[in-house]
């Protein structure tokens, strides 16, 4: 009799236990960079604060180093809801929404601050609306930083020095076309495969911010650091719309609040660490040089003409007002 009553009590309790378990939403936050990079440091801070302030309703866990896949794989996972959150560079979004390419056009911004203002203003709102239609919710502007060219052959001073150089780019049409305009031989490759490709000599060169060059140990396979600053790289904390729409409104607001807060913190980390990364890269043996920036800016003007029609009058108008 006691056993039957106990079993009956367990069966009655089961729906309540199931509902209690379902009350916690697990959010895996994936990215491709190393644990020492500012993306990951800020992501861990974001996760801790979300978990604490949601009182256990949300459980964010960070997966660095491409553990859940490369950028495109993770973004496709966001669309289907099989991955809940990610941090990606702006260029990763171009293959899902071509107009997002405006963010990392060559020499698009006079300063980081100008880019922040534009992407936290009407231009950023328009781009966020476009990717929301692709199943991705933008929770905050983060940063990759200024990108520079490294290579194993020679210093790059003029665009002519890139002629014939095999350079890896992200899987991004804009970046490929930029380096074609500069005379290089670009080819896209997923970030997770880049170190071994450089090590094997499949590429002569690559381009990334100082923080990524250092934390990914590219100084082991590259000799020259030419400060081209050809692209300011944005980054974004994204959530799967399928998952986000199932979260209660107060917790959605919390994710947005903390996504923006930790984005600001991460951007400060990038700014504060650039000089230190440059010093450490020099200590590792990399040879730095400045470039003829006006010559590079002139050489990429055809890329702007090529993409004007891709971005369309609305996005180009918002961009021009942002930089006026």
Describe these PLM feature segments.
Residues 2, 9-14, 24-114, 122-125, ...:
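N-terminal secretory/targeting leader peptides
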Residues 3-4, 18:
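Short, intrinsically disordered low-complexity segments
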Residues 19-23:
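Sec/Tat signal peptide C-region and signal peptidase I cleavage site
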